[in-house]
C-alpha cells in the first residue's frame, strides 16, 4: 500500500503509545493515557472534520467484541484505512455483518497468542491484525476478503442449528 508522506494517523486507544514511535504524524487519544504524547479523550465522543485518517490501534474488545465494533464503526466515519488488532471473532460473519459495509477487508495476519503482556508477564489472547480499506478510496486495490454473506448452516450430512 502506497501511503502519502503527509497522511495523519489516528490512534484512538493509544494507552502507553506503543505505535506512536512508528508514526510520523498522528493524533493519539486514550481515556487513561500513559504517555504525554497522548490526549486524554474518550474516542467514542471524539469529533473531527477530518475524514481521511489512517486509523491504527488495538481497541478495547469489550463483551462479544462490542467495544471493538464501536471503535471500528467510529473510525469508519473519519478514515480511509483502519488497521486494528482485534479478537479473532472479527473473522466471523457474526461480527463482520456489524461493521461499516463501505470497508473491504484488505489483509489480515493472525498474531501469536502470547503477543501481549500484562504486568510484565505474557498474556495469552487470540487476536488478528486486520487492514480494512474504504471502498473507492485511493487505497482501494479491489481486494475484499470480507465475508459478504452468512455461511451455510446446513449440509446434506448434518445441520448446524
Residue ranges with predicted function:
Residues 1-161:
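Class I S-adenosyl-L-methionine-dependent methyltransferase catalytic core
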